[in-house]
Amino acid sequence: MERIKELRNLMSQSRTREILTKTTVDHMAIIKKYTSGRQEKNPALRMKWMMAMKYPITADKRITEMIPERNEQGQTLWSKMNDAGSDRVMVSPLAVTWWNRNGPMTSTVHYPKIYKTYFEKVERLKHGTFGPVHFRNQVKIRRRVDINPGHADLSAKEAQDVIMEVVFPNEVGARILTSESQLTITKEKKEELQDCKISPLMVAYMLERELVRKTRFLPVAGGTSSVYIEVLHLTQGTCWEQMYTPGGEVRNDDVDQSLIIAARNIVRRAAVSADPLASLLEMCHGTQIGGIRMVDILRQNPTEEQAVDICKAAMGLRISSSFSFGGFTFKRTSGSSVKREEEVLTGNLQTLKIIVHEGYEEFTMVGRRATAILRKATRRLIQLIVSGRDEQSIAEAIIVAMVFSQEDCMIKAVRGDLNFVNRANQRLNPMHQLLRHFQKDAKVLFQNWGIEPIDNVMGMIGILPDMTPSIEMSMRGVRVSKMGVDEYSSTERAVVSIDRFLRVRDQRGNVLLSPEEVSETQGTEKLTITYSSSMMWEINGPESVLVNTYQWIIRNWETVKIQWSQNPTMLYNKMEFEPFQSLVPKAIRGQYSGFVRTLFQQMRDVLGTFDTAQIIKLLPFAAAPPKLSRMQFSSLTVNVRGSGMRILVRGNSPVFNYNKATKRLTVLGKDAGTLTEDPDEGTAGVESAVLRGFLILGKEDRRYGPALSINELSNLAKGEKANVLIGQGDVVLVMKRKRDSSILTDSQTATKRIRMAIN
């Protein structure tokens, strides 16, 4: 009331009215700027002059009971005067110091849990090592990077549901927690945050940091994983860089890295199978990365890499609309073209059918180590501005751009025949043929391209055919720039289609990706990748194939057993036996198969000769196309551990060891599982099966010629005698029976007789 009276009093004086009405507009605008709205216009200044006051803080009245009026030095901590316009107390900054030193202690147990991402960052920085600072020109390009180390990969909506469920469990509103990761995180966080006193809003903010990937489009030269991005301001400036090794890894970077490795392995493997697309999907669905299903990761993870994008396309997910060629990501920034097929002649007079793009187009090209801007017309490179880490990287980019331009002088620079094939031994398409050719040797290409004098343009220099820089001359249309070309920033995703051979096309039919574009770089995954699909057994080498094949038979023994007796051909054709074939020496594969199939047929024909362990042991050998021959084997060779190792047809070996007592099978010393049913111990072995319809007369008798194979016995006439090879290389004399009636008793007596004959 007092103030209003005072103001009225002021207004009644003519000078006041004059100042307020005649002040020029610009002053008025400034007054308005600083006095309108709730938003503080100059926070730093405001803070300075507030802190210069004695009591800049207001607090609830209850504070007077919790804090003494004066501290130990006798300084006043709060004022007895009330804050104007509210019933709060005016407090000195010294009160905050007093509170921090002498105030009540609360439990700190929840802090590391809530502020987990901060605590972890401190640890990483504590254990990180900073190296020397180098002053040099920094070629930075803007890339979309993950700025938030240590997060799960939930979508914003999924994270929102989890946060609501954890922080405000009683709040109304439909929340559906569906994915495995959502449920796990919710359960874990609810347990961690029991009796937590930190404000729910703060908890919600911190949870968001932990659950959602945050990306920014930042200029980077060097590492792009999130543990490098968090120290970007410390490691690279405009003209300097500081070496840094992170003091720890975070799961999200590991997931990204392992996902790329898994996807590359899967695409490479699928490309060589009979139906690449079906195989790829089967492998993606049967693979786990760090214990999480690969398909779940693909749905959530925004990593853009050729193999990863092929897997996403196969699953019907949207991917970036840029396309890949020669390991560079191309994005058309202007122009357009129409496609037509044209036949061209190489320098070796080989005819190539290429799809020519007619029209003027501009592209950005972004690779791991070089970037470029390309302007081209129909079969003509107009301008290429490249920047890269080193000579090698710049050369790679130039080769890719020259091939992409489809210029005649490039095609004429081909020496020799083009016959590059992919992993499945299929010829590559003409554009990739040309690319592979010049990646091997680009000397002729660069020499034939032509050179031109250049103008002096800031930040740009010329490059000669031998890749040396020059300020006078350059290869036609090609310049090297100090500035990098930014990655394509948009995160928009396009609907794409994929064909059986894993070629990904946009809706206008342009090929964006194909298996040829998948990098051959091998890396070691940070997280365990578990491939359940048999196609990926060979990824970890021969031993893994061996163990996995036998594990598969044991796991599926009930169905395998039925197929073995009723429909063996179908069983032999199962894809699970495919990888095993690569372990069997090629020259003898067919003979092993014929031998084992004959053996199995005899087991089927004769009651009581079924031997589970032996069937399991020999089954993978029967999968190869059989060759019928006279050969008998007492052991079969497999190539593992760099040499041939033997699997004994009868009995155990280091490769295949079945313990009858424990019913456990070990393959190369690794546990391959337990047999649920006991092989019938009492039955005679293979010999009795082999020798039905024959009478065993005794030991080998040389007068009756060389030992015959089991197959050849069927050619004997009734009553004819012959030596026969049985079991593990033992030979006995037999006679073909004159009557068929006694065949059944043979199998029982054969065993006893063989033992006598041998011993």
UniProtKB/Swiss-Prot annotation:
<dbReference type="GO" id="GO:0042025">
    <property type="term" value="C:host cell nucleus"/>
</dbReference>
<keyword id="KW-1097">Inhibition of host MAVS by virus</keyword>
<keyword id="KW-1262">Eukaryotic host gene expression shutoff by virus</keyword>
<dbReference type="InterPro" id="IPR049106">
    <property type="entry name" value="Flu_PB2_N"/>
</dbReference>
<dbReference type="GO" id="GO:0006351">
    <property type="term" value="P:DNA-templated transcription"/>
</dbReference>
<keyword id="KW-1191">Eukaryotic host transcription shutoff by virus</keyword>
<dbReference type="GO" id="GO:0039523">
    <property type="term" value="P:symbiont-mediated suppression of host mRNA transcription via inhibition of RNA polymerase II activity"/>
</dbReference>
<comment type="function">
    <text>Plays an essential role in transcription initiation and cap-stealing mechanism, in which cellular capped pre-mRNAs are used to generate primers for viral transcription. Recognizes and binds the 7-methylguanosine-containing cap of the target pre-RNA which is subsequently cleaved after 10-13 nucleotides by the viral protein PA. Plays a role in the initiation of the viral genome replication and modulates the activity of the ribonucleoprotein (RNP) complex.</text>
</comment>
<keyword id="KW-0899">Viral immunoevasion</keyword>
<dbReference type="GO" id="GO:0003723">
    <property type="term" value="F:RNA binding"/>
</dbReference>
<keyword id="KW-1048">Host nucleus</keyword>
<dbReference type="GO" id="GO:0003968">
    <property type="term" value="F:RNA-directed RNA polymerase activity"/>
</dbReference>
<dbReference type="InterPro" id="IPR049110">
    <property type="entry name" value="Flu_PB2_2nd"/>
</dbReference>
<dbReference type="GO" id="GO:0075526">
    <property type="term" value="P:cap snatching"/>
</dbReference>
<keyword id="KW-1113">Inhibition of host RLR pathway by virus</keyword>
<dbReference type="InterPro" id="IPR037258">
    <property type="entry name" value="PDB2_C"/>
</dbReference>
<dbReference type="GO" id="GO:0039694">
    <property type="term" value="P:viral RNA genome replication"/>
</dbReference>
<keyword id="KW-1045">Host mitochondrion</keyword>
<keyword id="KW-0945">Host-virus interaction</keyword>
<dbReference type="Pfam" id="PF20949">
    <property type="entry name" value="Flu_PB2_3rd"/>
</dbReference>
<dbReference type="InterPro" id="IPR048298">
    <property type="entry name" value="Flu_PB2_CAP-bd"/>
</dbReference>
<dbReference type="InterPro" id="IPR049113">
    <property type="entry name" value="PB2_helical"/>
</dbReference>
<dbReference type="InterPro" id="IPR049115">
    <property type="entry name" value="Flu_PB2_C"/>
</dbReference>
<dbReference type="GO" id="GO:0044423">
    <property type="term" value="C:virion component"/>
</dbReference>
<dbReference type="InterPro" id="IPR049114">
    <property type="entry name" value="Flu_PB2_6th"/>
</dbReference>
<dbReference type="Pfam" id="PF20950">
    <property type="entry name" value="Flu_PB2_4th"/>
</dbReference>
<dbReference type="InterPro" id="IPR049111">
    <property type="entry name" value="Flu_PB2_middle"/>
</dbReference>
<dbReference type="Pfam" id="PF20952">
    <property type="entry name" value="Flu_PB2_7th"/>
</dbReference>
<dbReference type="GO" id="GO:0006370">
    <property type="term" value="P:7-methylguanosine mRNA capping"/>
</dbReference>
<dbReference type="Pfam" id="PF20948">
    <property type="entry name" value="Flu_PB2_2nd"/>
</dbReference>
<dbReference type="Pfam" id="PF20951">
    <property type="entry name" value="Flu_PB2_6th"/>
</dbReference>
<feature type="short sequence motif" description="Nuclear localization signal">
    <location>
        <begin position="736"/>
        <end position="739"/>
    </location>
</feature>
<keyword id="KW-0507">mRNA processing</keyword>
<dbReference type="GO" id="GO:0039657">
    <property type="term" value="P:symbiont-mediated suppression of host gene expression"/>
</dbReference>
<keyword id="KW-1190">Host gene expression shutoff by virus</keyword>
<dbReference type="InterPro" id="IPR001591">
    <property type="entry name" value="INV_PB2"/>
</dbReference>
<comment type="subunit">
    <text>Influenza RNA polymerase is composed of three subunits: PB1, PB2 and PA. Interacts (via N-terminus) with PB1 (via C-terminus). Interacts with nucleoprotein NP (via N-terminus). Interacts (via N-terminus) with host MAVS (via N-terminus); this interaction inhibits host innate immune response.</text>
</comment>
<dbReference type="GO" id="GO:0033650">
    <property type="term" value="C:host cell mitochondrion"/>
</dbReference>
<keyword id="KW-0946">Virion</keyword>
<dbReference type="GO" id="GO:0039545">
    <property type="term" value="P:symbiont-mediated suppression of host cytoplasmic pattern recognition receptor signaling pathway via inhibition of MAVS activity"/>
</dbReference>
<feature type="site" description="Mammalian adaptation">
    <location>
        <position position="627"/>
    </location>
</feature>
<keyword id="KW-1195">Viral transcription</keyword>
